[in-house]
């Protein structure tokens, strides 16, 4: 259990650094007019989550502690959108398309709505 926490902490630091570094690079290249940095992080993070989840499950032998550190710590710090995408993918792969669609649209509506609500509360205080 302590090894798992250690790997999560280590990879979380690396994931956060990667996110910050990529944000600086993308914003320097494309500016801040559109959230290209966040979009690129979310897309790459989702790709890596899907890829590493199955690679470390089916092809590459790594300890469960290291796997959890990479996926939960590293990609969790890099982007939480990758976890949402993996959970949606798993629902579809398990033949639960209706549940997957419900989860996708509910998450999008609630999360964007929560962001708007937080902004509204912040602006009104």
Curated annotation (Swiss-Prot):
Q: Which residues cross the membrane?
A: 1-21, 34-54, 72-92, 101-121
List positions binding Na(+).
76, 79
Subcellular location, record wording? Cell inner membrane
Q: Which GO terms describe its molecular function?
A: fluoride channel activity; metal ion binding
- Top-level taxon in the UniProt lineage: Bacteria
UniProt catalytic activity: fluoride(in) = fluoride(out)
Membrane topology, record value: Multi-pass membrane protein
The record's annotation in Pfam families points to: CRCB
Q: Name one GO cellular component term.
A: plasma membrane
Establish whether keyword Ligase is in the entry.
no
**Activity regulation description:** Na(+) is not transported, but it plays an essential structural role and its presence is essential for fluoride channel function.
Among the GO biological process terms of this entry, one is:
cellular detoxification of fluoride
Q: Which UniProt keywords apply?
A: Cell inner membrane, Cell membrane, Ion channel, Ion transport, Membrane, Metal-binding, Sodium, Transmembrane, Transmembrane helix, Transport
- Tell me which InterPro entries the record gives: FluC
Name the protein family: Belongs to the fluoride channel Fluc/FEX (TC 1.A.43) family.
Main role?
A: Fluoride-specific ion channel. Important for reducing fluoride concentration in the cell, thus reducing its toxicity.
Q: Which HAMAP family match?
A: FluC
The protein's name in its UniProt record: Fluoride-specific ion channel FluC
Q: Which organism is it from?
A: Acidithiobacillus ferrooxidans (strain ATCC 23270 / DSM 14882 / CIP 104768 / NCIMB 8455)
Q: Which gene encodes it?
A: fluC
């Amino acid at each position: 259990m302590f090894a798992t926490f250690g790997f999560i902490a280590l990879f979380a630091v690396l994931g956060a650094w990667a996110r910050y570094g990529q944000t600086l690079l993308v914003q320097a290249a494309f500016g801040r007019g559109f959230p290209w940095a966040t979009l690129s992080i979310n897309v790459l993070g989702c790709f890596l989550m899907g890829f590493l989840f199955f690679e470390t499950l089916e092809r590459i032998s790594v300890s469960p502690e290291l796997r959890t550190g990479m996926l939960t710590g590293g990609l969790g710090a890099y982007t939480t959108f990758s976890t949402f995408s993996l959970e949606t993918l798993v629902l579809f792969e398990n033949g639960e398309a209706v549940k997957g669609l419900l989860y996708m649209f509910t998450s999008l509506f609630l999360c964007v709505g929560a962001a708007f609500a937080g902004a509204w509360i912040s602006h009104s205080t």
